[in-house]
Amino acid sequence: MIRKSLTALGILAATALTAAPATAYWEYGHETVAQIAYANVAPRTKVAIRRLLAQQALLDTPECPAGTIEQASVWADCVKPLKTADGKSRFGFAYSWHYQNVDVCAPFDLTPACKDGDCVSAQIDRDVTLLRDRRTSPHDRVQALAFLIHFVGDLHQPLHAGDRHDKGGNDVKTDYGIYAPARLNLHSVWDGTLAERAISAPPSLVRRYPAAERARIAAGTVADWSRESWQVAHDVTYASALGGDACSPVPPRVKLDEATIARIAPVSREEVRKGGLRLAKLLDNALS
């Protein structure tokens, strides 16, 4: 995921509206997904989460704490650059677990994107299995919890689920309103400026939702949610950037004007809400 946080000044310029928090989706979005989940799990699940995260020292990543659910939500990104004493990547094995590049211009098919289980949806299922099994080592259970919290957030960022052979939109240079730095791309817009605007809009997403609403949103399987996020990537993310046709040729730069931004921000917001309530379901199933 894009790791560069945008400044509050940049966000003001981008939106020409009210200021939004200055962290990109990889922090703010993930933390919000985690907070929604924590507000909606069963009391005994909260106890289990706290007990597991109290063992964060087992991860041996003091540079990347995971003692709270908010910290755990960004742990999987934080550890990406960590090296062993001889300079090798400690977590390189997990790089491909954050996404699944499923072509939005072809029929939905997870198989090529999830070869050998190296994709976000397969790892979500794996983490739930590890957490359910009390024979799993304490280290692996803590790590599985941190990965699970993060990966459910990743799955609900549409450009981690859909792709046009462009690295999940990273190759699509994008102007966000009047904010148009040379390196801004479609992925970073959905990670950062758009997510910040969407999440910051009132009312707060972090609250306990009615049981019927939780059940409705969390219905289905991880595979179902994968297809849904892929559909959002096709119908909204790429279509809004390419004049309505998600599979039309990509120009050197695309432009999201204010009307488009206002139309798609609620979609980004809803994906975060879905991610939080679905994470709550998985945590209850795995830990209660």
Residue ranges and their predicted role:
Residues M1-L9:
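Bacterial N-terminal signal peptides that target proteins for export
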